[in-house]
Amino acid sequence: MGKIRIQEVILEDNAKRYMLIDRNGFPVLPVMKYLKYLDQTGKSPNTQKTYGYSLKRFYTYLEEKGKDYKFIRLEDLIDFVGWLRSPYQSSNVTPLQQERAKRTEKTINLTITVIANFYDYLYRNEEVQNDMMEKLMKQVFTGGHSRYKSFLHHVNKNKPSIRNILKLKEPRKK
């Protein structure tokens, strides 16, 4: 048995596509369908590759935890964020002193977005029962009492915006 991996596939026209291969050497069908959907809807090969690697991390996590992708709860995604932040390959390791996260907040946010979109695709195709997007997103009213008002504040002040509850705060660029 090997590792879960991304396999690059070269098509007849030299275009690159990607497949997620499980430990037994077989393609992971739901991910294959999703990556094909991304291709059919015109997403670039780089986007497909990035999504493939994000899904590889997620399936590695699922395998480590012994979970089935069809029965994921919000609690599992919260644990997945912690797993992504861990500087160790295993979630069974507890550090004695604080260490830097293995991935940046931006990378983790991208991965969570990929997973949310993947589950939205599965839900719309009736492959999973739970609408994960409904659980991940919440409405937030942005018309607070701050002094700063955006140019279109008067248009949007009573409309809620939708935010992902798992999104990490990213440090500002210097």
What residue ranges belong to the model's regions?
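Residue-level marker of intrinsically disordered, low-complexity segments enriched
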Residues: 2-8, 18-19, 70, 126, ...
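N-terminal core-binding DNA-recognition domain of tyrosine recombinases/integrases
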Residues: 31-46, 56-150
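Intrinsically disordered, low-complexity regions
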Residues: 3, 26, 144-145, 173
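Basic/aromatic DNA-contact patch characteristic of tyrosine site-specific recombinases
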Residues: 1-43, 49-56
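Long, amphipathic, Lys/Arg-enriched alpha-helical "connector/arm" segment
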Residues: 95, 100, 147-174
